[in-house]
Amino acid sequence: MIIDKFKSIFLGLEIAYGQYQPGERGDNGKQKGKAFIVRGQVTDELWSNHLAGKGPALGIIPITEDNSCRWGCIDIDEYNFDHTSLIKSIRNNKLPLIVCRSKSGGAHVFLFTKENIPASLMQSKLKQMAIILGYEGSEIFPKQTEILVERGDTGNFLNLPYYNQMKGLRYAINDNGAGCTLEEFYKLYDVWACTKEQVEAIKTEEKKIEEAFPGGPPCLNKLATKMQEYFLL
């Protein structure tokens, strides 16, 4: 079935899920909407409807009942985002990440693993990678490193890509800046998905780049750093 690999890649907590009801767009062009948690099993019908673009998009909570996960994400919430420049920076830093366009036009930057790993390891590595890429302060999923389902914890969900497949505009982007079909995304996943040992071995030391404008505004130096990284390739 078409959902099988997609489901295996994005599997998370199975006793609750998220949904998002889109609303109108704001003055900045960002779509408004209502996000909420539904307590119940994540059924095959939900996965299938998501890929078919039927009903609300599916949000999955990455952290499971045993506090492990097989995917995590840096959520870069910027409108009119330059995904290609980000991918160049990712490859320049030799990070095993896949970039997807988010529903707002920003980026969901995924780290995938072939097996469940501790949520604490996933979260800490993604925080370090966000700093390297210049997006410190971005939301990181999983947001929790521990949940207690006995007391009703669920964790936070992330809206998945490929709602209505390519038509939904939430798709992976390859190293050339082109959008990927679902099958092309699966091939990207096969290339970049890591084992636990590979995640532990990811080097996350921030590169020391001399400030272009010593004593200048942080935002200006951040922009200059991104330009330096872009032309290092």
Model-derived segments and their meaning:
Residues 74-76, 81-101:
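Active-site-adjacent loop/helix surface patches within enzyme catalytic domains
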Residues 96-99, 105, 116, 131, ...:
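Internal intein/HINT superfamily modules and their associated LAGLIDADG
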Residues 84-92, 112-139, 166-187:
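Helical (often loop-to-helix) elements that flank the catalytic cores of nucleotide-handling enzymes
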Residues 1-71, 80-88, 156-157, 162-165, ...:
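DNA replication initiation on ssDNA origins
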Residues 130-168, 189-204:
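Flexible helix-coil linker/hinge segments at domain or subdomain boundaries
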Residues 74, 96-122, 148-161:
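Histidine-centered divalent-metal-coordination microenvironment in nucleic-acid enzymes
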Residues 61-63, 97-104, 139-143:
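Short beta-strand
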